[in-house]
Amino acid sequence: ISRSMDEPALKKNIDVVVKTGKEEKNVTGSSQGPKTFTYVEVYEATKEYFQGDLLATTVWVNKYALKDSQGKIYERTPDDMHRRIAREVARIENKYPNPLSEDEVFELIRNFRYIVPQGSPMTGIGNEFQIASLSNCFVIGQEGNADSYGGILKIDQEQVQLMKRRGGVGHDLSHIRPKGSPVLNSALTSTGIAPFMERYSNSTREVAQDGRRGALMLSISIKHPDAEGFIDAKMEKGKVTGANVSVRIDDEFMQAVIDNRPYIQKYPIHSDKPTYVKQIDARNLWNKIIHNAWKSAEPG
């Protein structure tokens, strides 16, 4: 037992380290702090809970057991997690008429039988150790001057803040001016969508979520003149590695593919008076989408 003489507060909170072979077991002698468990304790108890299912055990212990930023584990089995969730839900329930009790909520969610929360709620509800989102995924964007550099950076900031809180993010890039269109700065023309795909992708890779990168979905309308560049962006090795990409296809485009006739792309994509218009071979672009999806599983 090691105890610092200039920290008398530790008299009530002594961490005893008991070495048992390779495993170190922390036995907290505090009557105030929450109880902690070793990884081995949690793994073995959870394996018994899941009746020997090693995959379920590993996933729950690594992703959903309550932990703090130091890696200390505060839940021994999913029963502890369900009790935490039930306690917090009951606290909110008490603010409304005819509330469910903690035990009633617990019976609904225990053993993953009737209600199975999403991953983020399982981690975040009642969690006093981490700032975590209570939703798995978010779709973001903004109205108005969204294609300005300030608007593009604002979306980037929103993406990062959501990913810091364990949220997956999706946003559409159809509001960004196509490559070659005029802009009011020294560059004179827009760089198009591809560089901003890389920006958002890099932001995703920079934000670690407990050792794993965040999840990002980028999409574009087939009406956008940069749709082909968007579709090809991930074909170059090492590009846009932090995002998945999807194309929003409309009936008009598919009919043009069937009829083997040209298709008009424009920007803004819904404008009656577009500032940029481009005519393409619909069938050729469709074949490229199919080829890229076959080769790299994207675009979706």
Segments the model singles out, each with a brief description of its role:
Residues 1-300:
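Extended catalytic cores of very large enzyme megasubunits
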